[in-house]
Amino acid sequence: MRSNVLYSIETKSLTKSFGDETAVNDISLSVKDGEIFGFLGPNGAGKSTTIMILTTLLKPTSGQALISGFDVTTNAKLVRQNIGYVQQETTVDEYLTGRENLLLQAKLNHIQKDKIDKRIDEILTLIELTDKQDKTVVTYSGGMRKRLDIAGGLLHRPKVLFLDEPTVGLDIQTRRKIWQYIKKIHDEFKMTIFLTTHYMEEADQLCDRIGIIDDGKIQVIDSPENLKKAMGNEVISIIFEEGENRDSFLSELEKIEFVNKINKDGSKLTLFASNGPEVIPKIFYISSKLNIKITSISLTQPTLDDVFISYTGHEIRDGDSKFNQKREHAKMKRLRA
């Protein structure tokens, strides 16, 4: 049975356990029709497990997930007909041409023969690969391969497109070009896009709303702008040389007026303060008193990185994503064995 089609994705108390370990813990969220939704979380938070459930590759232990109103467990075939899934690792065959790859995808998705050529032409034009369609993929750049990957997920005109780390490993110029294509695809097809990323700028640029997951639980869901505004603080970042007075330094900082929260990540401290200029001289006074050497200090307005740190306690580090996905998949295999 179809549910409320105002929501392209709905989960209700979604849970997935492997033995004694709970990877996804009672997640309830709703993604509006036509929305670009970002799903963010640190290593091992449950992002990959959640996507595998939503794309019917893994069954939940309990709870429910609906895609376009269809249950991922009882209506898996209908769910697959309504989704496109572009994985982090490229899936194109590098010894086929771009067009041959899309022809293969069209056949796998059972697209009517009389519609295939027109559909491929439209997609190639949209992602600006028409002039490269007859070249073998082995000659493509990383950005071109990713565009072709995304094109393969669009051929059957899904209502929901899942993009798992779509720009990981690409340089910043290529990443921004992919962002433009994602926006273009969204505007052209009016589809819902569910995006995982560890690039905060990417989430800020693309997403209508984001959800932050940590330890298998949803911590917050809101628009990037609202999340930044809700911080209500300036951000003081400190890098210091750790020594025997480290704990005393942290304890003294917590007593400073206007300091509302402190996150520690190794030798880096992030302070959320309601009056940064008033706090900074006190930080230097305490560090001098305790003989703590500060190597760097900065005062900024809140960014999405700061929001993430506030809810999870640490940053998403560039380059961790690919390792984390392999680790999370390996953990799932081990626990199912």
Residue ranges and their predicted role:
Residues 103, 107-110, 114-132:
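Conserved ABC ATPase "signature" region
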Residues 136-140:
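Conserved ABC ATPase signature
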Residues 157:
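Conserved catalytic motifs of ABC-family nucleotide-binding domains
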Residues 161-164:
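Catalytic Walker B motif of ABC-type/P-loop ATPase nucleotide-binding domains
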Residues 180-274:
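ABC transporter nucleotide-binding domain
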